[in-house]
Amino acid sequence: MKNRLGTWWVAILCMLLASHLSTVKARGIKHRFKWNRKVLPSSGGQITEARVAENRPGAFIKQGRKLDIDFGAEGNRYYAANYWQFPDGIYYEGCSEANVTKEMLVTSCVNATQAANQAEFSREKQDSKLHQRVLWRLIKEICSAKHCDFWLERGAALRVAVDQPAMVCLLGFVWFIVK
């Protein structure tokens, strides 16, 4: 009876590890909305033209999510106060070539992002040096998180975040079976 109860606890632990609750990086859009702001009058709600979402390489994706990235003490305070102004993703598909390495992908992603968002980089702000430093660090982190699916097929990259909970579960089950 005690052995079965232990097996159930290991199974529950494995389910929690496999759910990847700890790897979620977004924290929500808590400070994005200004609740006391008056609503501007609209133009009758009629749509006059269709707008197509721009998916050019390097385009920022801004959804108001707060990413879990360390910018240093001063940068963390600035990012926490202004995260809704920063991108939380970059549209970039750089896996068209068969022999793309991780370094090539990150470099081309950063270059495409810089070319596509010149207005954002040239924007003058009172705290522009800190803003630019946080923005560049954010771009480098987002680009370095990108990967090509064919890397996994070739076995060139090991997805530790996915494989680690599976290995812990496997070791736990083997330990209980042997015991």
From Swiss-Prot:
Annotated region described as Globular, given as residue ranges: 51-155
Region entry Flexible tail, spans: 27-50
PANTHER family: DOPPEL PRION (PTHR15506), PRION-LIKE PROTEIN DOPPEL (PTHR15506:SF0)
Keywords: Amyloid, Cell membrane, Copper, Disulfide bond, Fertilization, Glycoprotein, GPI-anchor, Lipoprotein, Membrane, Metal-binding, Prion, Signal
Tissue: Detected in testis. Detected within seminiferous tubules, on round and elongated spermatids (at protein level). Not detected in brain (at protein level). Detected in testis, and at low levels in heart. Expression in brain is very low and barely detectable.
Keyword Membrane attributed: yes
Taxonomic path: Eukaryota, Metazoa, Chordata, Craniata, Vertebrata
Subcellular location: Cell membrane
Positions annotated as propeptide: 156-179
Cysteines paired by S-S bonds: 95-148, 109-143
Ranges where the record places region Cu(2+) binding: 125-142
Gene3D superfamilies, per database record: Prion/Doppel protein, beta-ribbon domain
Glycan attachment residues as annotated in the record: 99, 111
Any further remark recorded for this protein: Loss of cerebellar Purkinje cells and ataxia has been observed in mice with mutations that cause Prnd overexpression in the brain, suggesting that aberrant overexpression of Prnd causes neurotoxicity.
Membrane topology: Lipid-anchor; GPI-anchor
Comment on protein domains: A short helical region is required and sufficient for Cu(2+) binding.
Record-level GO BP terms: acrosome reaction; intracellular copper ion homeostasis; protein homooligomerization; single fertilization
Listed name of the protein: Prion-like protein doppel
Signal peptide: 1-25
Disruption of the gene: reported phenotype: Mice are born at the expected Mendelian rate and appear grossly normal and healthy. Females are fertile, but males are almost completely sterile, in spite of normal mating behavior. Two independent studies conclude that male sterility is due to impaired acrosome reaction, but describe contradictory effects on spermatogenesis, possibly due to the use of different mouse strains. Spermatogenesis is normal, with normal sperm counts, normal sperm motility, and no malformation of the sperm head or tail.
PTM annotation, UniProt: N-glycosylated. N-glycosylated at two distinct sites. O-glycosylated.
GO (cellular component) term, any one: external side of plasma membrane
MF-aspect GO terms: copper ion binding
Family (UniProt): Belongs to the prion family.
